[in-house]
């Protein structure tokens, strides 16, 4: 939940939203091209203009947020006063016959209507299982260097004002109950590092929450509350989604509980690098259903009320571009978190780039490195003591195949490695100094992220 943790948390105030914004600095293009299958959190470097330039905002109003959301300029009130016309409850045309009592007529008119569309049905069946998650932690504050100046200390003497060295960060997100004994799926960036987690149900009840585990690499976490006979969601199948089908988001944006928005699935399989978070091991669902800070961890539903994704992030300064983790991926990670409290991701230990003639020329000019090919996947760095280093992979090697399957770009390699298990042995076909070679690599476990 650190502001720069693998997935930072978006605070209440818009000007404090953490963002992934990439400049159009040509001097660093070759670094952005690198795709990492090796380290936990490679630094995002300037790149060519892409969707990520707009800035990715994680939609948990996470720890670090402060202040109160206040509605101002209530123009609706003036509109109601000046422009609204209040119609009579019963018009002349609708007066009941003499032999029918007025009370009976009014009662029939005021009776609740049946749900008029599938969204109403979905909200009624799933809404009670969507929760608000409040998290907080105590962090140490750094004293401004000026207050350590000996001159100031001599000047103020004993009247030097004490500086608080701790402060409480608070944040809000959403989640959904997946078991009637209180297991809840949410985003890792909502609860990472929290000292205290509180879960509030739609019926108003609140429970302390325990984080069973979180995985920053996929931004999935599981929270447990001690309660029974709870409403639950139905989990769908995100492997067979169709672009254009309905999408319904339920959550607590900006502290507004139980907010429902609708849209469609705009795209599937959005690669993490395409949206500005190359360290994430997820291919995202894109939707135009309105998602805002506080929606993080809430469900994205299909027309049948099944959860197909976990709402996670939006593109800042853009309309109708939100992203969700496919529920199949979230469920896979959550099962490991429930069982062991952690997740092991396959780790090769290289940084690589999809080569192009332009990039080949730029690398040669800026680094002096002579890349022998102008296409394919080139290893730019081998991490010390990594599985790749042990297998004798070298900088400048060109990856041609993995387990006999030809590879054409870095994203394909990353996807294939992500499907492997720790301990698997894989054969890599490489081109080195114009000679083809085959090397066998034993897949390791992705190292944990260092403290932020």
UniProtKB/Swiss-Prot annotation:
UniProt xrefs under SMART domains: PDZ (SM00228)
Matches recorded under PANTHER family: SERINE PROTEASE FAMILY S1C HTRA-RELATED, SERINE PROTEASE HTRA2, MITOCHONDRIAL
Residue stretches spanning the membrane: 51-71
Function: A putative protease, its function overlaps that of the related putative proteases HhoA and HhoB.
GO biological process: proteolysis
Membrane topology category: Single-pass membrane protein
KO phenotype (gene knockout): No effect in a single knockout, but growth is inhibited at high light (120 umol photons/m(2)/s) or at elevated temperature in a triple protease knockout mutant (hhoA, hhoB and htrA). Triple mutants are not phototactic. No effect on the PSII repair cycle, even in the triple protease knockout strain.
GO cellular component terms, A-Z: cell outer membrane
Protein name according to UniProt: Putative serine protease HtrA
InterPro entries documented for this protein: HhoA_HhoB_HtrA-like, PDZ, PDZ_sf, Peptidase_S1_PA, Peptidase_S1_PA_chymotrypsin, Peptidase_S1C
Family from the record: Belongs to the peptidase S1C family.
Every PDZ domain range: 352-434
Alphabetic keyword roster: Cell outer membrane, Hydrolase, Membrane, Protease, Transmembrane, Transmembrane helix
Localization in the cell: Cell outer membrane
Signal peptide coordinates: none
